[in-house]
């Protein structure tokens, strides 16, 4: 069947050569999907690739080699990748990967795929077995001159009318917005393994992408706005930072409006959220400081306006608007990573900040001005709302620290002791706004020099007066200073610090927002 497809490709190219100048490149590739039933796609056939102006298109193949048995995984189109430039054959070069992958340039170049082992080894080529001539083949050769031309004309007319979006197996009749700055993950083998969390906008899966574990946040179609918002935040220049969740891709999965799922693929962190970790673990003084310092560093960077960020362009100031311990993830060394930017808002000079509804976020972590509905819709006001929530998360850390000479209680959420696990908006307004209550700071915490100073910082974060709250950058510097002063002290110095904690020089409140 190779000859008919080649002839058809030549006819199509000759008809379109005149009209294709200045337009995006097109490519035709062999298509195959081993998971076609699960992903609700065709199992095999041809895929027509359509790219953007000045972008090159390739074909690819991926497969497994289990004890000499070749298991084809996927074939199809691949977007502009310099590793594929000018490759006429599909050749995988990695040594013994779990999944082999190759890409090439040229129509149907992924029909044959090859693994070229380390130098000196034999080249192993995998090629579809030849098939005996069939009646269908004979008919194809006989009818090709007339039928092929008719088919090309019909295809050209149909494509002109429908304008299929590039790489799209899904059409949900919307403007998809700017594409995310990442390769198309949908063409790589991705397997969902287990659900790790469920939230307001869907569920989070642990998944395997090639040889790595990733997190896949799946939104139902009705929560499209949250998916789009988070994708746009991740696509903002300068969002690559050690203390911000690493973004990999955003995709639409499914084949009809009723079955579409919206996927957000990010790095996976096995320790989970800070909430989950504190529930099961008591932390040391150094662990508390490390989490607090890296968490405040991440929020400080998010809040910062960077005119020219590492050559990527202008990074605007961003308010999180749903800062809480559940949205702080932990790396293996307990470095904090901020996540869940579905409610975040950007503040770009000369542009409105977008959707800035007042009462958004998690009720328990809402600042007094949010509970009152008395928000000043300016950048600094939103950053101060984040800082109130930061104070509550720091309190959660202190409540599970064993540094103080006293009992460590079971983990509790902020205000859980005062108004339970499911407080109403009215209860929070009464406690936080009218009574101006805050989570209890235990007496024995104040007997530890470091915790005592940290409690002062916490109180300045959740101050009822929003303008008096510290900035995230100031909190980062405070925690670093406290950590160094305590860790460098001798036992005798610790005794004197306990009696003179109020005289310790903290960073001045001029560092507040």
UniProtKB/Swiss-Prot annotation:
Cytoplasmic side: 159-513
EC number: 2.7.11.30
Cross-referenced InterPro entries: Activin_recp (IPR000472), Kinase-like_dom_sf (IPR011009), Prot_kinase_dom (IPR000719), Ser/Thr_kinase_AS (IPR008271), Snake_toxin-like_sf (IPR045860), TGFB_receptor (IPR000333)
Residues engaged in binding ATP: 196-204, 217
Membrane topology listed for this record: Single-pass type I membrane protein
Co-factor(s): Mg(2+); Mn(2+)
Signal peptide: 1-18
UniProt-annotated catalytic positions: 322 (proton acceptor)
Residues on Extracellular side: 19-137
Localization: Cell membrane
Catalytic activity, reaction form: L-threonyl-[receptor-protein] + ATP = O-phospho-L-threonyl-[receptor-protein] + ADP + H(+); L-seryl-[receptor-protein] + ATP = O-phospho-L-seryl-[receptor-protein] + ADP + H(+)
UniProt KW keywords: ATP-binding, Cell membrane, Disulfide bond, Glycoprotein, Kinase, Magnesium, Manganese, Membrane, Metal-binding, Nucleotide-binding, Phosphoprotein, Receptor, Serine/threonine-protein kinase, Signal, Transferase, Transmembrane, Transmembrane helix
Region (Interaction with DYNLT1) location: 492-513
Sugar-modified residues: 42, 65
Gene Ontology molecular function terms on file: activin binding; activin receptor activity; activin receptor activity, type II; ATP binding; growth factor binding; inhibin binding; kinase activator activity; metal ion binding
GO biological process: activin receptor signaling pathway; adrenal gland development; anterior/posterior pattern specification; artery development; blood vessel remodeling; BMP signaling pathway; cellular response to growth factor stimulus; determination of left/right symmetry
Post-translational modification: Phosphorylated. Constitutive phosphorylation is in part catalyzed by its own kinase activity.
Disulphide-bonded residues: 29-59, 49-77, 84-103, 90-102, 104-109
Listed transmembrane segments: 138-158
UniProt domain Protein kinase: residue ranges: 190-481
One Pfam family from the record: Activin_recp
GO CC term, one of those recorded: plasma membrane
Oligomer and partners: Forms an activin receptor complex with activin type II receptors such as ACVR1B. Interacts with VPS39. Interacts with DYNLT1. Interacts with BMP3. Interacts with BMP2.
Its job: Transmembrane serine/threonine kinase activin type-2 receptor forming an activin receptor complex with activin type-1 serine/threonine kinase receptors (ACVR1, ACVR1B or ACVR1c). Transduces the activin signal from the cell surface to the cytoplasm and is thus regulating many physiological and pathological processes including neuronal differentiation and neuronal survival, hair follicle development and cycling, FSH production by the pituitary gland, wound healing, extracellular matrix production, immunosuppression and carcinogenesis.
Family: Belongs to the protein kinase superfamily. TKL Ser/Thr protein kinase family. TGFB receptor subfamily.
The name this protein goes by in its record: Activin receptor type-2B
Naturally occurring in which organism (per UniProt): Rattus norvegicus
